């Protein structure tokens, strides 16, 4: 218990990053626990059989598109729509894990696999707003986290995305899992 309001304010200012990190971690763990209990078997089964990737997506993710090295799933909701993509590509260069390379790869994969509703329209990274790339360690392994905005070239859609990029050493490939709204 804090002795007074001023000490709470001072503590919060002094330990701002630690407090934010704590609440983010607690919320992430809550979401992980929920996804371990209830998840989309459609997504899990298709990713496991086609890309040899295990991923728990929310249970309401049922609509999907599956091609070689690319998987897309959505809750297909009229409001509160969420999408998930997973794609892989061969690991050939240590420079793969840079913001520039991953944005270029993302754009080429999305252009080929997520066309818009109008001819010639496609999804791409909105680089004018800036993209944030952060290397982290996840379960003892390197992971690149990219956050930014996407837009539909030739159409009027867009929103935020977060992607996690990891090296699959066993299969000599890079695996990207991304969520966007």
Per-range role (PLM):
Residues 1-2, 6, 112-172:
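Signature of long, low-cysteine stretches enriched in small and polar/charged residues
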Residues 2-7, 83-88, 172-180:
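Short, well-ordered beta-strand elements
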Residues 5-9, 79-83, 92-95, 153-158:
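Short, surface-exposed beta-strand/loop "edge" segments at domain boundaries and coil↔beta transitions
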Residues 10-33, 55, 61, 172-181:
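Surface-exposed amphipathic alpha-helical segments
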Residues 24-34, 45, 76-81:
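Charge-rich, low-complexity N-terminal segments
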Residues 36-65:
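N-terminal "mature-domain start" segment
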Residues 58-117:
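Secretory pathway targeting signatures of secreted, lumenal, and periplasmic proteins
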Residues 75-78, 149-151, 180:
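Secondary-structure transition/turn motif
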């Amino acid at each position: 218990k804090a002795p007074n309001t001023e000490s709470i304010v001072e503590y919060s200012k002094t330990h701002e990053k630690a407090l934010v990190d704590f609440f983010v971690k607690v919320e992430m763990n809550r979401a992980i626990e929920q996804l371990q209990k209830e998840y989309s078997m459609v997504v899990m089964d298709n990713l496991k059989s086609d890309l040899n990737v295990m991923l728990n997506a929310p249970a309401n993710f049922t609509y999907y598109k599956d091609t070689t090295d690319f998987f897309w799933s959505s809750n297909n909701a009229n409001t509160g729509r969420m999408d998930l993509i997973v794609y892989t590509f061969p690991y050939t260069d240590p420079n793969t894990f840079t913001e520039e390379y991953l944005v270029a790869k993302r754009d080429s994969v999305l252009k080929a696999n997520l066309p818009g509703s109008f001819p010639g329209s496609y999804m791409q990274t909105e680089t004018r707003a800036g993209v944030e790339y952060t290397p982290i360690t996840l379960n003892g392994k390197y992971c690149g986290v990219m956050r930014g905005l996407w837009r539909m070239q030739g159409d009027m859609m867009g929103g935020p995305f977060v992607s996690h990029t990891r090296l699959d050493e066993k299969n000599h490939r890079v695996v990207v899992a991304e969520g966007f709204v």
